[in-house]
Amino acid sequence: MCLTRFLACLGPTEVVKVAGVLLAAGSGSRFAGPSHKLLAGIGGEAVVTHAARSMVNSGLSGYLLVAGATELSSALTEFSELVIVENPESEHGIATTLSVAVDWGEAAGFDALIVGLADQPGVLSSSWRRFSNSYAPIAVSNYDG
């Protein structure tokens, strides 16, 4: 597989088909709450619901959530445009989850993927949009730094 197909570096005059991806396949083993961390409540909604809403409201061309260790679909019913794919090898680490996302992106004809983590509910839709307009082969976010 050629990963260069996913580089969003075509420049501002090119139309690039960009998908947002939330990685949500981990076991959340360090979280001490009564449920999986992605199902923990913030303001009456699951963490994963907040993260998915932000991504889906960003205006990208497509949206994927890669699940694995726990059932998340009940927290995502409002997002008809969100594709949910299971990573059957999630216990082998985040690289396998990213590989599932890249395979999906390639099969669906996307030019670039913006990858986020489903346990980061504070990422804004505007942040997803900014990344889609970066025209850089690799873009990394930072906070207060």
Cite the ranges covered by each PLM segment.
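N-proximal low-complexity "stem/linker" segments adjacent to membrane-targeting elements
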Residues: 2, 6-21, 28
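Nucleotide and nucleotide-moiety/phosphate-recognizing core
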Residues: 17-145
